[in-house]
C-alpha cells in the first residue's frame, strides 16, 4: 500500500481499514471529508489524475463557499471491496459499471448516480487465430472466458438473446470460465474457446496476433467473422436489430459516479464541488486530445499506449465532452435490469426516476457553475448514444422497462 499525502491513492482492503465510519456531520468540522472509490484501470482514472494534478476539487469547493475539503481518492482493483466500503459508510463515493449499479439501486438504501465517468466499451468476442469459431452459432457447446455476473457476462447474454431468443447460455451448451485477472484476456487460455473481452486489452491482443475478433458490443463484426452477412470486419450482424438499445449497443456501457444518499443529503455543496471538478477535467482532457488523455492515465491502464489511444476515442465522456446524466442514460439501467440471467430484481421505472431525482439539484448547480455546457438543445440531439432530458428535469422523465 502506498499513500501520497492527503490526496494520494490507497489500495483495496487496506484503504477501507484506514477509513473511519462516516458518522460525523461536516457541519461540525472545518473541512469536509470526502472518501472516493475509483477504478484507475478504467477511463475514470484519467479524470481522477487530472483532478488531483490541478486541485480541481479543492478549487471548486472554494468557489462554492465551503471552508475546505479533504479528498481521499482510493484505488480499488477489486470491485467487491468498493461496494463493501460504500455499503458500510466507509466510502461516500464510488465508480460503478451498470451491472453493479443496478444491483446497488435495488437495495433498501440505494446510492444515487450523479455523473457519467465512462462508457462505450466495445467488449469484443475474441478467439485464437486458428479457431473454427466464426459466428455466434459456432459458439454453441463452447467455453467462454469472462467475469461471471459482470458487465462482460451481461454483454454475452444479450448477444445470445438477440441471436437465439434465450438468455439461458446452458441451454445453448455454452460454458462459462471465470477469469482471475484481466491479463488473461490478452491471449488464448488452456481449455477456453473464446474470450468475452474489453478494450484496450482486446485491441492489444489483436495487434499482437494472439486473438482475433468475431463480434463487438455495437453489433459490428470483426475480421474473423463469417456468416450470412458476409465475411470480415465492419458488417452489422442481422440479429443486432433485435436488441432494444440498437443502434448503440447490446449493452449501452456506462460507468457511473455514485454517492451515498445520506452523504448527499448532508453535504450537497461537497457533492456539487466533485461534479464541477469532474466536468472541468472532462472538458480539459477532451480539448487536450487523445494523446494527452493517454499520457495522463496510461500508467494505470492495460494494453499498449497505441491500443489505449484507440480505446479512448470510444469513451463516452471523450465523445460527448460532458458528464451529465440524461433520461436515456437512466433508461438503460431500467431496461438492462430485466435481464433475468444476470439480475434477480428488476429496477422499477418509477423507483429509478425518484432515485435519480435526488441528484437533480446538485447536478443543476454543477451545470450552471461550469458555464451551462453543453447548450440545452444538445441533450435532445439524436446520436448513437441515448440522450434525452438532463437529470435536473427528472421530474418529467418517463422511464420504461
Residue ranges: model-predicted function:
Residues 2, 8-28:
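N-terminal export signals
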Residues 44-50, 74-112, 123-134, 153-154, ...:
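Pocket-flanking alpha-helical
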Residues 188-298:
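Pocket-lining segment of extracytoplasmic ligand-binding domains
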Amino acid at each position: 500500500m502506498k499513500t501520497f499525502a492527503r490526496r494520494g491513492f490507497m489500495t483495496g482492503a487496506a484503504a477501507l481499514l484506514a477509513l473511519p465510519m462516516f458518522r460525523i456531520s461536516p457541519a461540525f468540522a472545518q473541512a469536509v471529508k470526502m472518501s472516493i472509490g475509483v477504478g484507475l484501470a478504467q477511463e475514470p482514472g484519467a479524470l481522477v489524475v487530472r483532478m488531483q494534478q490541478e486541485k480541481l476539487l479543492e478549487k471548486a469547493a472554494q468557489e462554492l463557499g465551503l471552508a475546505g475539503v479533504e479528498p481521499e481518492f482510493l484505488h480499488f482493483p477489486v470491485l467487491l471491496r468498493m461496494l463493501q466500503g460504500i455499503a458500510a459508510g466507509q466510502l461516500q463515493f464510488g465508480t460503478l459499471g451498470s451491472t453493479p449499479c443496478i444491483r446497488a439501486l435495488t437495495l433498501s438504501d440505494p446510492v444515487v448516480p450523479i455523473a457519467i465517468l465512462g462508457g462505450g466499451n466495445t467488449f469484443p468476442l475474441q478467439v485464437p487465430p486458428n479457431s473454427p469459431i466464426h459466428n455466434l452459432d459456432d459458439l454453441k457447446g463452447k467455453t467462454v472466458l469472462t467475469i461471471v455476473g459482470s458487465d462482460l457476462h451481461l454483454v454475452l447474454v444479450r448477444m445470445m438473446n438477440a441471436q437465439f431468443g434465450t438468455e439461458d447460455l446452458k441451454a445453448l451448451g455454452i460454458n462459462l470460465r471465470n477469469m482471475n485477472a484481466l491479463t488473461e484476456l490478452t491471449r488464448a487460455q488452456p481449455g477456453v474457446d473464446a474470450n468475452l473481452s474489453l478494450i484496450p486489452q482486446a485491441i492489444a491482443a489483436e495487434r499482437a496476433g494472439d486473438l482475433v475478433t468475431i463480434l463487438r458490443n455495437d453489433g459490428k463484426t470483426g475480421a474473423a467473422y463469417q456468416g450470412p452477412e458476409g465475411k470480415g470486419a465492419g458488417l452489422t450482424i442481422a440479429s443486432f436489430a433485435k436488441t432494444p438499445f440498437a443502434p448503440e449497443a447490446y449493452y449501452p456501457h456506462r460507468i457511473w459516479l455514485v454517492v451515498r444518499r445520506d452523504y448527499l443529503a448532508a453535504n450537497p455543496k461537497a457533492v456539487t464541488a466533485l461534479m464541477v471538478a469532474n466536468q472541468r477535467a472532462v472538458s480539459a482532457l477532451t480539448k487536450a486530445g487523445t494523446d494527452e488523455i493517454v499520457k495522463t492515465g496510461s500508467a494505470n491502464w492495460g494494453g499498449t499506449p497505441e491500443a489505449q489511444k484507440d480505446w479512448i476515442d470510444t469513451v463516452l465522456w471523450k465523445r460527448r465532452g460532458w458528464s451529465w446524466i440524461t433520461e436515456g442514460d437512466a433508461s438503460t439501467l431500467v431496461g438492462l435490469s430485466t435481464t433475468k440471467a444476470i439480475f434477480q430484481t428488476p429496477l422499477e421505472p418509477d423507483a429509478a426516476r425518484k432515485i435519480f431525482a435526488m441528484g437533480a439539484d446538485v447536478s443543476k448547480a454543477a451545470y450552471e457553475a461550469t458555464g451551462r455546457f453543453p447548450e440545452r438543445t444538445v441533450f435532445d440531439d439524436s446520436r448513437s448514444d441515448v440522450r434525452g432530458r438532463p437529470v435536473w428535469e427528472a421530474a418529467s422523465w418517463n422511464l420504461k422497462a
